[in-house]
Curated annotation (Swiss-Prot):
InterPro entries documented for this protein: GCS_T (IPR006223), GCS_T_bac (IPR022903), GCST_C (IPR013977), GCV_T_N (IPR006222), GcvT/YgfZ/DmdA (IPR028896), GcvT/YgfZ_C (IPR029043), TrmE/GcvT_dom1 (IPR027266)
SUPFAM superfamilies for this protein: Aminomethyltransferase beta-barrel domain (SSF101790), Folate-binding domain (SSF103025)
Superkingdom of origin organism: Bacteria
Record keywords, A-Z: Aminotransferase, Transferase
Gene source species: Chromobacterium violaceum (strain ATCC 12472 / DSM 30191 / JCM 1249 / CCUG 213 / NBRC 12614 / NCIMB 9131 / NCTC 9757 / MK)
Subunit structure, interactors included: The glycine cleavage system is composed of four proteins: P, T, L and H.
Catalytic activity: N(6)-[(R)-S(8)-aminomethyldihydrolipoyl]-L-lysyl-[protein] + (6S)-5,6,7,8-tetrahydrofolate = N(6)-[(R)-dihydrolipoyl]-L-lysyl-[protein] + (6R)-5,10-methylene-5,6,7,8-tetrahydrofolate + NH4(+)
Coiled-coil ranges from the UniProt annotation: none
Family classification: Belongs to the GcvT family.
Gene Ontology CC, one term: glycine cleavage complex
Name of the featured protein: Aminomethyltransferase
Role of this protein: The glycine cleavage system catalyzes the degradation of glycine.
Underlying gene: gcvT
EC number: 2.1.2.10
Length: 362
């Protein structure tokens, strides 16, 4: 067993009272005392997450654009100015999901952020796709990344970066602001406003302390999961993986079908799937009574078929259980979940469940 890796913020987590756990081979904070309280802080104020375990890859070379247009399902040609970002799946030729990621246009090429647990697989896959392209990849382990999220996140970051306040406030969602080795992006994984900020690793702890002094609470991975689930956001390895099509995982919106001549990996398989009719779809499930919907539980849709819960939890905001599920495409507004041998009625809803701290489904 190799020892788990540590982010540049490890000592700051310990000092803040974090309970550390192994997550994708990294020692990460699961909470700092109360997962529930941390969840509520992000919904009502501002919290910060260490996401330095995720992998930042800088992409350069004359063919970087053409290579990315083959590698991912969304189209980097949409990125019209430096700092603009898009979300995409990286697909196999069979049209299943290798990983989900964000790509930013930069002055030198592109910057990609991929998941921690898939990094080695992703890099091997990307290297295998480079033949015939003038493209180079550089993994930026010299950077740390902090996500500052919540209704007061922008205000509190601006209070410690007053010289950038105007530029930060001007950022729209999925836009980034490069500042030397620092990079501020108006992105997140919580369903709240906020920033994901890349900083040189040796400046990460001092920035963490500045944020603490500005009233930004550290938040663990436990609350990160309940927040993203309320926001209806996928988690790789749970809601989609290399056995699942993006069309069956709520990722259809991330596929750029035009221009028709762009031959991205998996395109033919997805077109065939669309032509034949997609068999499964992703939905939200709501259980307003007792019980908790958990990953792996069977979903039964009368006279239609069966599906499965891919992520489930008790929602701290809604005070009842919610889940993301993959169910037969013909599923309507009602289904049942097998809770300890009892088929229990659940509502089928369109996600997200929560946006900006408020319930948004019907």
């Amino acid at each position: 067993m190799t020892a788990p890796k540590r982010t540049p913020l490890f000592d700051a987590h310990i000092a803040a009272g974090a309970k550390m756990v192994d997550f994708a081979g990294w020692e990460m904070p699961i909470h700092y005392g109360s997962q529930l309280k941390e969840h509520e802080i992000v919904r009502s104020d501002a919290g910060m997450f260490d996401v330095s375990h995720m992998t930042v890859i800088d992409i350069t070379g004359a063919d970087a654009k053409a290579w990315l247009q083959k590698l991912i399902a969304n189209d980097v040609a949409k990125l019209g100015f430096e700092g603009k970002a898009l979300y995409s799946g990286m697909l196999t030729p069979e049209g299943t999901v290798v990983d989900d990621l964000i790509v930013y246009l930069t002055a030198y090429g592109y910057r990609m952020v991929v998941n921690a647990g898939t990094t080695e697989k992703d890099l091997a896959w990307m290297e295998s796709q480079k033949a015939g392209f003038d493209v180079a990849l550089k993994v930026r382990r010299d950077l740390a990344m902090l996500a500052v999220q919540g209704p007061k996140a922008i205000q509190k970051v601006c209070s410690i970066k007053p010289e950038l306040a105007e530029a930060i406030r001007a950022l729209k969602v999925f836009q980034g602001l490069p500042q030397g080795e620092w990079f501020y992006a108006r992105t997140g994984y919580t369903g709240e406003d906020g920033l994901e900020i890349m900083v040189p690793a040796d400046q990460a702890i001092s920035f963490f302390h500045q944020l603490q002094a500005a009233g930004v609470s550290p938040i663990g991975l436990g609350a990160r999961d309940t927040l993203r689930l309320e926001a209806g956001m996928n988690l790789y390895g749970h809601d989609m993986d290399e056995t699942v099509s993006p069309l069956e995982a709520g990722m259809g919106w991330t596929i750029a079908w035009e221009p028709a001549e762009r031959k991205f990996n998996g395109r033919e398989a997805l077109e065939a799937q669309k032509a034949a009719g997609v068999k499964m779809k992703q939905v939200g499930l709501v259980l307003e009574g007792r019980g908790v919907l958990r990953e792996g539980l069977k979903v039964v849709v009368e006279s239609v078929g069966e599906g499965v819960i891919t992520s489930g939890t008790f929602s701290p905001t809604l005070k009842h259980s919610i889940a993301i599920a993959r169910v037969p495409a013909a599923t309507g507004a009602a289904a049942q979940v097998d809770l300890r041998g009892t088929l229990t009625d659940v509502r089928v809803v369109k996600m997200p469940f929560v946006r900006n701290g408020k319930k948004v489904f019907e």
